[in-house]
A protein has these predicted regions:
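Enzymes that bind and transform nitrogen-containing heteroaromatic metabolites
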Residues: 2-186
Length: 186
């Protein structure tokens, strides 16, 4: 059984959402934030990413310099550059193996962190294992779409890292780091 206590590497969550916790429409991102994409790359480079198949499909290609682990219900699904798994536990095992194999090859780049990369089902399954969330909050008027799970705000220490006003068609957004106040160990 997978518990936080027996995790080999810490699991982080990275997400962009609006004030209604909307993360997408089930197919695409709802906004384009070039600065956030650079930030995402910097934070996740050298780490395994765990994502659902719909998230993989919306990206359309593997993200270089990272393991692209895709959790899918299909036992026959394959895609170039993806590591297909059928359970969250298998995703963690593959992520740990990738870290172990890559840390010796390129220890300057490989991070001992696993990132939950979306979508909503991946966050729902994996959030209990996370003690850190890298969050982008986007000012974007939408009340319908795929939602990030509701957090118990009192369980998290929130630090605002940066705020960006709307400019040149890019919506207002801010970067936050959430750290769980009491880390759950089972």
């Amino acid at each position: 059984m997978l518990t936080k206590k027996n995790l080999k590497n810490p699991i982080f969550c990275i997400v962009a959402m609006n004030e209604n916790r909307i993360i997408g429409d089930g197919k695409n991102l709802l906004w384009h934030l070039p600065g956030d994409l650079k930030r995402l790359k910097k934070i996740t480079m050298g780490s395994p990413l765990i994502m659902g198949r719909k998230t993989w499909d919306s990206i359309g290609r593997p993200l270089p310099g990272r393991a692209n682990i895709v959790l899918t219900n299909s036992v026959t699904w394959k895609a170039e550059g993806a590591i297909a798994v059928n359970s969250f536990k298998d995703a963690i095992i593959k992520a740990d193996e990738w870290i172990d194999n890559n840390i010796e090859i390129n220890q300057n780049v490989t991070q001992k962190k696993i990132f939950l990369f979306g979508g909503a089902e991946i966050y729902k399954i994996g959030l209990e294992y996370c003690d850190n969330i890298e969050m982008t909050k986007v000012k974007f008027n939408s009340k319908t779409g795929t939602k990030f799970p509701k957090l118990n705000e009192s369980d998290w220490k929130k630090t605002k890292l940066e705020h960006n006003l709307a400019k040149n068609g890019v919506p207002e957004h801010s970067y936050w780091h959430y750290r769980r106040k009491v880390q759950i160990i089972e």
